Amino acid sequence: MAPLPTNPLGSINQFQGAAKDLADELDYLKGKTARATAGAGLAVSIPNDVLSVAFMAKGYAHGRVSSSIDQQDIDYLRRIQRSNVVAAGVALDAALNGTDQITKNLNSTASGRAAIVSDYGVAVARQFDLGGVPVSVGVTPKLQKTWVYNYTTSIYDYDSNKWNDSRYRTDDTGFNVDAGIAADFGEHWTVGVSGQNLMSRDIDTKDIRIRNGRTGEVVSYKDTYQIRPLVTAGAAWHNDLVTLTADGDLTETKGFKSEDTSQYVGVGAEVTPLSWLAVRAGYRADVKGNDSNVFTGGVGFAPFSTVHVDLMGLYGEDETWGAGAQLSMTF
């Protein structure tokens, strides 16, 4: 943020210039929100003709930084900017009573909220033959650890290094389960349904209270992180060279209660011109219209069919971008 002058009795023009810069920044931040997601995972599989078992650990994070800009803050700063009399009066008041006489009249807030979820579980899967149709069923019971952060403060005091302080953090541990089923029809078609986090969980953030400098009213800032079942259905057509996929969420994607929900559909294609090389492209859209639609692309390498390296990137509207990598080894 633009700094307020430490010596309010200095140049009135400088004081008004600082007020203008700060008002301009508040105008720019009004309604702005930034979101980010990240994930990582590790799995060790033990294939078996009767029952396949895999030990898994994965984590994913969801974060959002947003501002709540009070229009009265902007109006107050514009009055300082445009009137020498107002600027001189505010500067004199600050000189006599301290510079907090200025900032106490500014009540815009900034909020950084984040959730980090880690899963530790054992996945078991088995294939059956139902009327000549190969059907695979898998279940993953898992321990789920969640950390939820709610760093909300005056926008003029916001410090991104403080968001993970323990006084803004809530910890929670629970149990959850994933499950899925897939069937192969003929040589080229596979259809399936998967369910993640089949047990709903709610984790409340810390209740952060901020006093309004103008009215004296104490405002409570609290949220709830929602873990909800996510059920997705998909189909794939494949041969030795090409795989085409389509999938869609049958349930909404939840996050913080204060956020809009999303529900995604996507299509993708993979071409394997060489036994050790795969090239991928796809598109994902939010049918709710609350998240950016994105294009994805990637490449996979499998030298000697032992080491598998997958790289991907995505790009979409509203300055949405991302990247990912996966490494696996077969022994």
Task: Give the label of every model feature segment.
Residues F15-Q16, E25-Y28, A110, W163-D165, ...:
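N-terminal start-of-chain detector that recognizes signal peptides
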Residues A40-N48, F55, Y120-R126, V139, ...:
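Residues on the lipid-exposed face of transmembrane beta-strands in outer-membrane beta-barrel proteins
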Residues R82-V85, A94-G98, N176-A182, A285-D286, ...:
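Noncatalytic linker/hinge segments flanking ATPase motor cores
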Residues H188-F331:
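Outer membrane beta-barrel transmembrane domains
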Residues D24-T37, A110-V117, R167-G174, D223-P229, ...:
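Short sequence motifs at beta-strands and strand-loop junctions characteristic
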Residues M1-D165:
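A subset of solvent-exposed loop/turn segments in beta-rich extracellular surface proteins, enriched
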Residues V139-K206:
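Loop-centered beta-sheet repeat module
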